[in-house]
Each structure stands twice: as structure tokens, then as C-alpha cells.
Amino acid sequence: MKLISYKQNGNIKLGAFEEGKIYDLHALDGHIADNMLEFLQGGEEQLQLAMAAMEDGSPTISAEDVELISPVPNPPSVRDAYAFRQHVATARRNRGLEMIPEFDEIPIFYFTNHHAVFGEGYFPVLSRHTEKLDFELECAAVIGKGGRNISTSDADDYIAGFMIMNDLSARVLQMQEMKLNLGPAKGKDFGSTFGPWLVTKDELEPYKKSSADGDRYDLKMKAFVNDIQVSGDTFSNMTWTFAQIIERVSYGVDIFPGDIIGSGTCGTGCFLELNGSKITDNQWLNLGDTVSLEIDGLGTLTNKIVLENG
């Protein structure tokens, strides 16, 4: 199932997307939550109600008539991990640094701004953000049930589904503040984009590769800037799985339905890495540029960079 959040007549609603049409799930069955967070909190019962409603009902809304927003518009938290070895090793090598051995010891993550989540469409920035503005091609897992001290062997059961994530980054701000060995902060917290929908795990079964370390999915990942492909990798190349990341995240801490965890940038998944490897020539995102991230099974997330009003 492809779950979405959308705006219609000023209201935010929960829906399911299918072939360009939208099911208004709450309208089909009043027992289904009318927003994504409550839907996820309802767990398997809500999912089964939604599946039954879609079987009995029909989509009544054209996707062209509504505004898609972040599938989880008000997440309790957003964490971003650092799970792809190629990206980490290449980015360090480009700065004349050896691969950091601690990468193989623990899956690391940071918190970003859970009040600055965007979906499809315009992405507003201020002038200082445009100083080496970068995209980051990532996949995000959405937590489907609460837990604490979760083992790797159990962690995949806590994932409701996946969506595309663009962790946009202002590199000049980021590099300045991280010299202080704390962060990232202003280089990241102005926003990330997610979407276009939250895909439940059952739709991704054909791509799944299970192991003792947790599930991986053989999904091609691509990034396009102004319709020109600049990046490509595969989701299954994650060195650390989401299951391992969740074990680390949940140690001594509760996680909640709707929490978002990003994979971190995939190999070649940003201009910082591409420019350093001389694949691109000092290319960054500019005002008016369109960036599209595409992952097999998860769709395409497209954003246009615009100047924030005021």
C-alpha cells in the first residue's frame, strides 16, 4: 500500500494512492484514522481496515487535484544515520583522510529538525543556504510500533514502511559549524523532504534480501538535477541495516510510531562526494533547480529550489 498525506481545501488528510487516484480512507470507513500519525499508532488493525476499505470502495480523488505533503507530516522525531560505506570512505578520501575505523563499530546517527519536513514541490531556502546547497539521496524507514531496547533480530518488525528522503544540506554553513566538533546544526535543520508516499513493506517483498543482520532491499537509487542523472546506487548496499540502526537507536530510549530514520547518503548520493571525486565540476544546487530522487518501488520525489518569502 502507498500511504499519503495530502492537503485538500486547507485540510490535511490521510489517503492511499493507486494509479493516479486517491482513496480517502477515513471517508470510506470512519474507524480508520484521518491522519497518518494516529493511523500508525493503530498498528496492524488500522492497516487491515484500510485494506478492506480499498477492496470495498473506490478512489474518488485525482492526485492532480490535491497537494501531496510529507507522508508523515508531524513525526515525533527525525534521525538520520550514516550507513553507506562508499559515501563515507569516498568523502573522507576526497578530504585526504583515512577511513574512520569507528564506522565498523557502531551505526551512528544524528537528530534533525522534525518540524521542518516537506513533501513534493517547492523547497524554500534563504540566501545563505544557497552557498553550496546540496541534495542527499537517501531512503527513510518509518517506525510502526513503539519499543525500547530492540534487538537486531526483532527490529524489522518495528518498521511500517519506507519512503524517499532528501536530506538537503547547506555545505558552507555545515563545514563552518562542524569545525567545532558538534553538529550538524544550521547546515541541515532548515528542512528535509520526504515522499512521495510511504510504501508498506508487503509491497517490497520481491526486493527483500534477508540476513542475520536484518533485511535489505535490492532497489536502485537515482538522483536527477534538471532532468540529468547525477547519481546512482542500490539500497541493498547499506553497510548497516535499518535493523542494526534501530537496535542502536532504541538502546535505553523509547521509539514511537511515526518516528523517521534516514539511511544516510548512498554512494555518489550528493554533490559533496561527486565534486570531490571529479565526477561533477563544482556543481551545487541553485535557485530554480529541480532535483528528483528515484528509488525502485518507492517512486520519485521531486522538489524545486525557491527563495523563501520574507
Where are these regions (language model features)?
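Charged, cofactor-coupling segments
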Residues: 1, 5-29, 177, 186, ...
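Short gly/ser/thr-rich secondary-structure transition/capping motifs
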Residues: 61-62, 121-124, 274-276
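Beta-rich strand-turn-strand
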Residues: 252-262
